């Protein structure tokens, strides 16, 4: 089977822009879906991408369609609506989804794509927009190994760690576990940093201590940078997305008969913050949000 030459990209946001930029840099033809957020789209068009009006048009013009959207509801809309990916799917098309999505939704989409004579793989990603721009994302892949090998040259444009996790939906299942871990660390770290600050502890000294021991983590360093230097650039991940990802994890666990008391508490904290107006703020600001909750208790 020939390697894909025509790539379509649906979702040119914080992560999608870097993905598209690196695909173009390697000489692939790229079509992108029109979006009201003009900046990233126009930048890619200026680099040689073609802007198309509907997911159907993107699918029809592509050998490989990569989707990078916010949640399963958005993904299902892009696939199943009248002018969606399914309407433009053709024999030989491969759809690769980077979304952090619910595995049961993934399986439904994969089955529909297969009925069109096309193929589906899930390739959710980790790391940040900085790594997307640098072409150094981590991909957790689920699907047929031969299909993934076929699109590997494209994936190598924007990822430097690609791990095959199993059949279709395995990538999304691994991603939910990964995000539960990282976002759980984030909430614990925010609470610990607030307690340290309120207790008069020198946060720089605390960072030095934690950095030299087993409690250190990338998430700790990112939140500590915000608490100490007000640096909110190291983790550009919205609180609303954090709440969604942990909710997806608990939904997956329900189907596995796994109790999730810790995940439920973490989800409640992120969801409360989102509902109080902090939905679009980045996760490190949970240090401030927890502080404001404690002020209200006085």
Name each region found by the language model.
Residues 30, 51, 120-121, 162, ...:
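Hydrophobic beta-strand scaffold residues
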Residues 19-23, 109, 154, 195:
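Hydrophobic residues within alpha-helices
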Residues 169-294:
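Helical "substrate-binding/catalytic lid" subdomain
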Residues 55-119:
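Rossmann-fold NAD(P) dinucleotide-binding segment
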Residues 1-67, 93:
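NAD(P)+-binding Rossmann beta1-loop-alpha1 motif at the extreme N-terminus of oxidoreductases
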Residues 100-183:
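Rossmann-fold dinucleotide-binding core
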């Amino acid at each position: 089977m020939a390697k894909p030459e025509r790539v379509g990209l649906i979702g040119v946001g914080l992560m999608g822009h870097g993905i598209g930029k690196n695909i173009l840099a390697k000489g692939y033809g790229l079509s992108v879906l029109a979006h009201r957020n003009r900046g990233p789209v126009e930048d890619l068009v200026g680099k040689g991408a073609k802007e198309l009006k509907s997911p159907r048009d993107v699918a029809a013009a592509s050998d490989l369609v990569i989707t990078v959207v916010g949640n399963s509801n958005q993904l299902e809309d892009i696939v199943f609506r009248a002018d969606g990916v399914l309407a433009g799917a053709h024999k030989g098309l491969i759809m690769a989804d980077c979304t952090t999505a619910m595995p049961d939704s993934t399986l439904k989409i994969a089955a529909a794509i297969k009925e069109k004579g096309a193929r589906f793989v899930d390739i959710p990603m980790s790391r940040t927009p900085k790594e997307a721009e640098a072409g150094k994302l981590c991909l957790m892949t689920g699907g047929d190994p031969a299909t993934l090998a076929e699109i590997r040259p494209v994936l190598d444009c924007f990822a430097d760690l690609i791990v095959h996790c199993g059949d279709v939906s395995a990538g999304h299942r691994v991603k939910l576990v990964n995000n539960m871990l990282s976002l759980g660390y984030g909430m614990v770290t925010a609470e610990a940093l607030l307690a340290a600050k309120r207790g008069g502890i020198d946060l720089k000294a605390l960072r030095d201590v934690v950095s030299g021991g087993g409690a250190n983590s990338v998430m700790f360093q990112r939140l500590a940078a915000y608490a100490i230097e007000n640096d909110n650039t190291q983790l550009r991940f919205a609180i609303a997305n954090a709440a969604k990802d942990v909710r997806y994890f608990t939904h997956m666990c329900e189907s596995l008969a796994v109790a999730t008391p810790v995940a439920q508490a973490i989800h409640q904290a992120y969801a409360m913050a989102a509902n109080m107006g902090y939905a679009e703020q980045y996760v490190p600001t949970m240090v401030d949000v927890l502080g404001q909750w404690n002020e209200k208790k006085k």
